[in-house]
């Protein structure tokens, strides 16, 4: 990745709220399936804004060293085909994770905050276009500079 796009908490909140507006009326949804881990943050905003309390997760590991995507590994999945659920992730990048999500939850509404060209067509809605060669630094990954997770120390 040659470029970086740094997202602040304020920016993230604003974009996630905009995504929430597009999902109204809230009464059409049974719940949210958050793609762990990046989708946990927008799921919290969507849940608050839409008044949704039923939150499930699907846990898929794809980024193995903060930079390169590796083979997908499903660690946990919410049951069902997604009918009446919003599936949310922070980003659709190459589309590898998105294709797996679509296979698991074909009847869900799949949304992300950010989308890169290679994966954008795989989600039903997103807020911000990001160039394919750009790495997104999400606010939960940052201190004043990148802070590695405690488990890696």
UniProtKB/Swiss-Prot annotation:
This is Xanthine-guanine phosphoribosyltransferase. Its cofactor is Mg(2+). Xanthine binds at residues 93, 136. It comes from Pasteurella multocida (strain Pm70). It catalyses: GMP + diphosphate = guanine + 5-phospho-alpha-D-ribose 1-diphosphate; XMP + diphosphate = xanthine + 5-phospho-alpha-D-ribose 1-diphosphate; IMP + diphosphate = hypoxanthine + 5-phospho-alpha-D-ribose 1-diphosphate. Disulfide bonds: none annotated. Guanine binds at residues 93, 136. It is a peripheral membrane protein. 5-phospho-alpha-D-ribose 1-diphosphate binds at residues 37-38, 89-97. Purine salvage pathway enzyme that catalyzes the transfer of the ribosyl-5-phosphate group from 5-phospho-alpha-D-ribose 1-diphosphate (PRPP) to the N9 position of the 6-oxopurines guanine and xanthine to form the corresponding ribonucleotides GMP (guanosine 5'-monophosphate) and XMP (xanthosine 5'-monophosphate), with the release of PPi. To a lesser extent, also acts on hypoxanthine. Mg(2+) binds at residue 90. GO terms for molecular function: guanine phosphoribosyltransferase activity; hypoxanthine phosphoribosyltransferase activity; magnesium ion binding; xanthine phosphoribosyltransferase activity. Keywords: Cell inner membrane, Cell membrane, Glycosyltransferase, Magnesium, Membrane, Metal-binding, Purine salvage, Transferase. Pathway: Purine metabolism; GMP biosynthesis via salvage pathway; GMP from guanine: step 1/1; Purine metabolism; XMP biosynthesis via salvage pathway; XMP from xanthine: step 1/1. PROSITE patterns: PUR_PYR_PR_TRANSFER. InterPro entries: PRibTrfase_dom (IPR000836), PRTase-like (IPR029057), Xanthine_Guanine_PRibTrfase (IPR023747). GO terms for biological process: GMP salvage; IMP salvage; purine ribonucleoside salvage; XMP salvage. Its EC number is 2.4.2.-, 2.4.2.22. It is an enzyme of class 2 (transferase).
